Amino acid sequence: MSEIRNYTLNFGPQHPAAHGVLRLILEIDGEVIERADPHIGLLHRGTEKLVESKPYNQSIGYMDRLDYVSMMCNEHAYVMAIEAMLNLKVPKRAQYIRVMFDEITRILNHLMWLGTHGLDVGAMSIFLYAFREREKLIDCYEAVSGSRMHATYYRPGGVYRDLPDKMPQYLASDFRTSKELETMNENRQGSLLDFIADFVKEFPKSIKQYDDLLTDNRIWKQRLVNIGVVSANRAKQLGFTGPMLRGSGVEWDLRKNQPYAVYDQLKFDIPVGMTGDSYDRYLVRMEEMRQSNYIIKQCVKWLRENPGAVMSDDHKVSQPKRTNMKNDMESLIHHFKLFTEGYCLPEGEVYRAVEHPKGEFGVYLISDGANKPYRVKIRAPGFSHLAAMNEMTRGHMLSDVVTIIGTQDVVFGEIDR
């Protein structure tokens, strides 16, 4: 009689629910997962080594391409590390702008997660709802940086430029009538802050729509409740951070526990789960969007009342004004040196981390006194979460693997680096 053995199934790396180039070797008994072995590295681009070959100010763009749905949060950790080494003072207005865009980025990330997680488990319409709002926030990225994704907006010493006084508008085309164009540009008549204020006012209605679609939906709860349960103690042992840790009931958020920028001057709550399952993590992220919306509202109010500089006036680090370069030789030299050689950091090492939408995103930077880093180590939150895949899926059905990948909210740009 032949021996009965478990079936080995390859999941990915080309799979619509893999959220990138994830390959899972699944050992299954019928439809029950016995073992899940994640294979990573298929998107490895050697980012940490690339950063070592460029001056400090030329590596900000690499950060955008790590977690490519949470771009500005990646930049924030890197520029904070450089600023700490240089003892560089960042203008308060620039810090408020950074916090505002960190929270815009958090909403962008969670909308992407919500839409794709819905598609993974069969809720098709939520994807269209989520991307409706996401498009508006992507326009805010474009307004300040000219880019819809890889902004490179944060710079050591502040941000690239102040918020624009005029929000970009849709142009006439053969594909839209004049009436449609007028409707699309209705809330784009003022400044970027006016546009964001309008978004903040309307966004709670959108979150209620998502709630109505999913939160009490019987099928949604059947797919998420008691799936991928991780206890609070085990979540800490596994190195979970962000919504994965808070979903297990641990109230840990760097914005509250180790405040940076101006988070200690803002009011917001930290949502935590109770059971540590996929449904709790869904509820945590939904509430995080509400809290981010509230933080943005406070930032808009402060920025309207407090004009000022958005970049350090140390021109060894920040570029001089172009008007000065036309008349002042020293400004021209500083500009040339800044974009060819960059600047040197004192010898030493520093670790700076931010509360990224996916967890703790940290940059450990070692300087040997040159104009390039000696070593940059990136602490990606998704790496620890994916490492728990075997433990989270064991004993679940094959269809639940897709739910667990979705609830982890993994992006392989940061995991593979």
From Swiss-Prot:
It catalyses: a quinone + NADH + 5 H(+)(in) = a quinol + NAD(+) + 4 H(+)(out). InterPro entries: NADH_Q_OxRdtase_suD, NADH_UbQ_OxRdtase_49kDa_CS, NDH1_su_D/H, NiFe-Hase_large. Pfam families: Complex1_49kDa. It is an enzyme of class 7 (translocase). SUPFAM superfamilies: HydB/Nqo4-like. Its EC number is 7.1.1.-. Keywords: Cell inner membrane, Cell membrane, Membrane, NAD, Quinone, Translocase, Transport, Ubiquinone. Its main location: membrane. It is a peripheral membrane protein. It is found in: Cell inner membrane. GO terms for molecular function: NAD binding; NADH:ubiquinone reductase (non-electrogenic) activity; quinone binding. GO terms for cellular component: plasma membrane. It comes from the Bacteria. NDH-1 is composed of 14 different subunits. Subunits NuoB, C, D, E, F, and G constitute the peripheral sector of the complex. NDH-1 shuttles electrons from NADH, via FMN and iron-sulfur (Fe-S) centers, to quinones in the respiratory chain. The immediate electron acceptor for the enzyme in this species is believed to be ubiquinone. Couples the redox reaction to proton translocation (for every two electrons transferred, four hydrogen ions are translocated across the cytoplasmic membrane), and thus conserves the redox energy in a proton gradient. NCBIfam families: NuoD (TIGR01962), PRK06075.1 (NF004739). Belongs to the complex I 49 kDa subunit family. This is NADH-quinone oxidoreductase subunit D.
